């Protein structure tokens, strides 16, 4: 019998990101709309539209960092490092535009 090895923290991170998506649906939709507005903008408007998009992305990242750091603070240092690495991996898979450079 072969046991499937589960990724550490997979279940808790999945639940955290599901909850994040529900609780921040409006902000995530704003990010999508801002990206579309930037993509559709005329050259003279593009820089301003991009700035708005970047501000929204930073807000999402700040909230994701808060979620990650809040849970990590309940763990010992070594376990927290493993959790943060697993969180970053799942975040890059699920939300690539938000997870590239979390501190």
Task: Give residue spans per PLM region.
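Amphipathic alpha-helical binding modules
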Residues: 72-103
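Amphipathic alpha-helical interaction modules
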Residues: 24-68
